[in-house]
Amino acid sequence: MLRVENLHVRRGGKDVLAGIDLQLLPGEVLGVLGPNGAGKSSLLGGLSGELAAHQGQVLLDDQELAHWSGAERAQRLAVLPQASSLDFAFRVEEVVALGRLPHQTGRVRDEEIVNAALNAADVAHLSGRSYLALSGGERQRVHLARVLAQLWPGQPGHNLLLDEPTSALDPLHQHVTLQAIRAFADRGAAVLVILHDLNLAARYCDRVLLLEGGRPHSLGTPTAVLRPEPLKAVFGLEVLVQEHPERGHPLIIAR
């Protein structure tokens, strides 16, 4: 289990994140929302250990994250950053197979997992193609498959951190991606996903953290958090919130 206590992160001598207390729960998708500059990517950086905590601590299975070896950490924690740079002409399946490097499961099992992750991210049809020949959205889905393969099939004790995994995707693949993430959590993994689309968060997330100015504004179920008052306070946006006629989750409509 991944949790943070009173997390503060500094950049350039100023706090970009302050007062964060958070626990990722097995089987849960936690969505992180907020305007640009709210601290969403800084939160992911602090949780993953990429950014050092100026104050507070990050704990993985009740042990400070910094005390884990790289390989042991990678077997429990996978991170998909906002931008994943790769300048080599690897085939798609080779990129996804990079997620298996921390493991010692053997070639046959690794190939099975890579194929399963390719299918989950809807990129199996791209196998054999050069990564460099792909569109931005295709590359994003290949990297999703890579981090899924790293923790496949997802189970309690696994933690997946995703920074805007739908940003380059068309509407269909936004849902395909979040359905894959939802299925991963349903098998027991804890997932944190940064999103900008309020309605995607309402549909796929169990809890939502609303950030404002690097601090937590609201944390709770989508029904509790995605209300007109908090959304006006954080985004400056006037909205109507209705119940989805078929699924029952909040449906947010800009006025």
Curated annotation (Swiss-Prot):
CDD domains: ABC_Iron-Siderophores_B12_Hemin (cd03214). Residues 2-238 form the ABC transporter domain. Its main location: membrane. It is an enzyme of class 7 (translocase). It is a peripheral membrane protein. It comes from the Bacteria. The keyword S-adenosyl-L-methionine does not apply. ATP binds at residues 34-41. Keywords: ATP-binding, Cell inner membrane, Cell membrane, Membrane, Nucleotide-binding, Translocase, Transport. SUPFAM superfamilies: P-loop containing nucleoside triphosphate hydrolases. InterPro entries: AAA+_ATPase (IPR003593), ABC_transporter-like_ATP-bd (IPR003439), P-loop_NTPase (IPR027417). Its EC number is 7.6.2.-. GO terms for cellular component: plasma membrane. GO terms for molecular function: ATP binding; ATP hydrolysis activity. PROSITE patterns: ABC_TRANSPORTER_2, HMUV. It is found in: Cell inner membrane. Part of the ABC transporter complex HmuTUV involved in hemin import. Responsible for energy coupling to the transport system. The complex is composed of two ATP-binding proteins (HmuV), two transmembrane proteins (HmuU) and a solute-binding protein (HmuT). Belongs to the ABC transporter superfamily. Heme (hemin) importer (TC 3.A.1.14.5) family. This is Hemin import ATP-binding protein HmuV. It comes from Pseudomonas fluorescens (strain ATCC BAA-477 / NRRL B-23932 / Pf-5). The lineage of its organism: Bacteria, Pseudomonadati, Pseudomonadota, Gammaproteobacteria, Pseudomonadales.
